[in-house]
Amino acid sequence: MKTIIVFLSFLVLVLATKFGDANEGVNREQTKEVIQNEFRGDFLNEMAAMSLLQQLEAIESALLEKEADRNSRQKRCNGNNVPCGPDHPPCCSGLSCEETFGYGWWYKSPYCVRPSKG
């Protein structure tokens, strides 16, 4: 009796291995298809991610340029009693570039002064 049980167990094991091998070829093909589709999908997803990354970098650079323009200082201006003219920065608001007393013989350039009333 024990011999028959061992023989039947061996037979079941051989048959399971045999039929398992028959389905393995189909399983391998299905596995290859799944892997190819996953890699194809991953490739497309990676391309979409790269495109999105490039778009984000372009937007970020545009925003940084705008922010740099917004935070940039205005050109400096000359204050009161400071030389002005074509070789110097312009006078600040509220001041005008005028030829004061001594211009020509003492001073080489006009100066930023408050405009005279009158």
From Swiss-Prot:
The disulfide bonds in this chain are C77-C92, C84-C97, C91-C112
List the propeptide residues: 17-76
Any single Pfam family the record assigns to this protein: Toxin_22
Q: Where is the signal peptide?
A: 1-16
Q: In what tissue types does this protein appear? A: Expressed by the venom gland.
Cellular localisation: Secreted
Q: Which GO terms describe its molecular function?
A: sodium channel inhibitor activity; toxin activity
What main location does UniProt list? Answer: secreted
UniProt keyword list: Disulfide bond, Ion channel impairing toxin, Knottin, Secreted, Signal, Toxin
Q: Which is a Gene Ontology cellular component entry for this protein? A: extracellular region
The free-text function statement in the UniProt record for this protein reads:
Ion channel inhibitor.
What does the domain comment read? The presence of a 'disulfide through disulfide knot' structurally defines this protein as a knottin.
The similarity comment for this entry is: Belongs to the neurotoxin 14 (magi-1) family. 06 (ICK-Trit) subfamily.
Q: Please identify the protein, giving its name as recorded.
A: U16-barytoxin-Tl1e
Q: Which organism was this protein described from? A: Trittame loki
The organism's taxonomy opens as: Eukaryota, Metazoa, Ecdysozoa, Arthropoda, Chelicerata
